[in-house]
A protein has these predicted regions:
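Conserved SAM/SAH-binding beta-strand->alpha-helix loop
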Residues: 107
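S-adenosyl-L-methionine-dependent methyltransferase catalytic module, highlighting the catalytic core
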Residues: 148-149, 157-254
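Conserved SAM-binding strand-loop segment of SAM-dependent methyltransferases
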Residues: 122-133
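Conserved alpha-helix/loop element of class I SAM-dependent methyltransferases that forms part
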Residues: 56-74, 91
Length: 255
């Protein structure tokens, strides 16, 4: 039986050593530069008491957050897939209408960082769950008003399985992902046209957990969504010149 998310979070706080620093102290009295330094490398940038810490990616002010709420303004419970270090998680939770964000992340080191930042900024709406999203039972987490899947789908070897699971727990799905161009098609897998992409492994914080992932074409991606009951798919942005490959932003709904 899966333990309640709040119970998992309490265990994570102990397991990942967040309590090694005395959080009873005011933030101003903690050597934040040292605490961030000993947890590096960081991808996400965090602004705390007017100072920047961590990496260079400003997830808290990422435009994809506003795009998500443009299409799902009434989402009060959100499942985030691929939380990284919690930047998007906290930004989603900052919206007044949001009551709960469950942020699933596959790397324990990223969860430790996210929980550390959470103790600093006091965002109590976010619950972090360690989950390999290639095989984790998302249904055990319950139902959600919307799923936020940004920067994750193109890292899994079976994206069709992940979308099927999302469709079982939410009628609304936001996706930002890379995809294969029609001129890049190498394989037809599970009835989907696309290509295999080599992943960097566990040592790369921006890589998937498996050795390779499958990138479907845009047409195959949309077919996956409609096949799983998402009757309306909004193409928000199609980035044809993204430095890391073709990328698309979609909002899919069963309504």
């Amino acid at each position: 039986m899966l333990e309640p998310v709040w119970c998992c979070r309490l265990k994570l706080l102990t397991l990942y050593g967040v309590n090694r620093i005395d959080m009873a102290q005011p933030v101003q009295q903690i050597d934040l530069a040292h605490e961030f330094e000993r947890r590096k490398p960081w991808v996400t940038k965090f602004l705390i008491d007017g100072r920047e810490y961590g990496g260079h990616f400003d997830a808290m002010n990422d435009g994809r957050i506003s795009q998500f709420f443009q299409y799902f303004p009434n989402a009060s419970t959100i499942l985030e897939l691929g939380a990284l270090e919690g930047g998007h998680s906290f930004s989603l939770a900052n919206q007044p209408a949001v009551k709960r964000v469950v942020a699933a992340e596959g790397r324990p080191s990223n969860i430790e960082k996210a929980l550390f930042v959470q103790t600093l900024i006091g965002s109590q709406k976010v619950e972090f769950v360690e989950a390999n999203l290639e095989d984790f039972d998302l249904l055990a987490l319950g139902n959600f008003d919307a799923v936020f899947c940004s920067g994750l789908l193109y890292h899994v070897p079976e994206p069709w399985t992940l979308i099927e699971r999302c469709a079982q727990l939410s009628s609304n799905l936001f996706i930002w992902t890379h995809y294969a161009g029609e001129d890049e098609v190498e394989k037809v897998v599970h009835g989907l046209r696309g290509k295999w992409h080599r992943e960097g492994g566990l040592g790369d914080p921006l890589s998937g957990l498996s050795k390779k992932s499958f990138w479907p074409t845009l047409g195959s991606l949309i077919n996956m969504l409609t096949k799983n009951g998402y009757r309306t798919v909004h193409l928000i942005e199609n980035a044809l010149k993204h430095p890391n490959g073709l990328a698309v932003t979609l909002a899919a709904t069963k309504a």
